[in-house]
C-alpha cells in the first residue's frame, strides 16, 4: 500500500475481508453522530499466512482503511512511515456552470475506533529512508519487510 493514494471503500473492505472473517472492518461516522459499521462477512477465504504491509506518507484513504483494519486485528505487520491521514467521506454537490462543492460529510474510524483523519496509521515498525538510502537506491523498508517476514515464517 506504499504510495497508494486511495481508491474505493468497497475494494478496501473486500481485501480486508480476505484476512478478517468476523467483526467490524471500518466505521463511518457522520457529522450528526450517526455511525455505520461495515462488518466482515463470514467467508471460507480467510488468509492465515504471515503478512507484511508497507505504508508511507503517500498511503491515503482506502489504503489507510485497509492497513488500519489489518493492524487492529493483528493480521499483518505494518512497516514504513505514518500514512497520510485522509480518513474522510466527501460528497460533491453540483453547482451551476459545471462546478461543484466538495463537502466532507463523515469520517472513517478503524475497527478499534481510531480516527484516521489528519492522524494517519502509525506503522508497527517505523522505517524511514535516509538521503543515503535514496542516493544508493536502497529500499530499506522492503529489506526490513523481508527480514521480518523470514522471522515470522521461521516461528510457524
Walk through the language-model features, giving the residues of each.
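Sec-exported extracytoplasmic/periplasmic mature domains
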Residues: 17-24, 59-60, 71-75, 147-154
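Gly/Ser/Thr-rich loop/hinge elements
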Residues: 5-61, 88-94, 109
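Terminal peptide-recognition signature
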Residues: 19, 51, 70, 113, ...
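Conserved P-loop NTPase
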Residues: 90-93, 101-129
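C-terminal recognition in membrane/secretory proteostasis and scaffolding
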Residues: 1-12, 28, 36-38, 127-156
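Generic beta-strand/beta-sheet core signal
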Residues: 1-2, 28, 54-56, 79-81, ...
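Short, well-structured beta-strand/strand-turn elements
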Residues: 73-86
Amino acid at each position: 500500500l506504499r504510495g497508494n493514494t486511495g481508491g474505493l471503500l468497497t475494494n478496501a473492505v473486500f481485501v480486508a475481508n480476505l484476512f478478517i472473517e468476523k467483526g467490524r472492518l471500518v466505521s463511518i461516522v457522520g457529522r450528526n453522530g450517526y455511525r455505520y459499521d461495515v462488518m466482515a462477512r463470514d467467508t471460507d477465504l480467510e488468509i492465515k499466512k504471515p503478512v507484511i504491509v508497507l505504508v508511507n506518507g503517500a498511503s491515503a484513504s482506502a489504503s489507510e482503511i485497509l492497513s488500519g483494519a489489518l493492524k487492529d486485528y493483528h493480521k499483518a505487520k505494518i512497516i514504513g512511515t505514518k500514512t497520510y491521514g485522509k480518513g474522510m467521506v466527501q460528497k460533491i454537490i453540483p453547482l451551476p456552470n459545471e462546478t461543484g462543492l466538495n463537502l466532507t460529510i463523515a469520517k472513517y474510524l478503524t475497527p478499534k475506533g481510531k480516527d484516521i483523519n489528519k492522524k494517519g496509521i502509525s506503522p508497527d515498525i517505523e522505517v524511514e529512508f535516509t538521503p543515503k538510502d535514496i542516493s544508493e537506491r536502497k529500499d530499506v523498508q522492503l529489506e526490513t519487510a523481508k527480514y521480518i517476514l523470514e522471522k515470522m515464517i521461521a516461528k510457524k
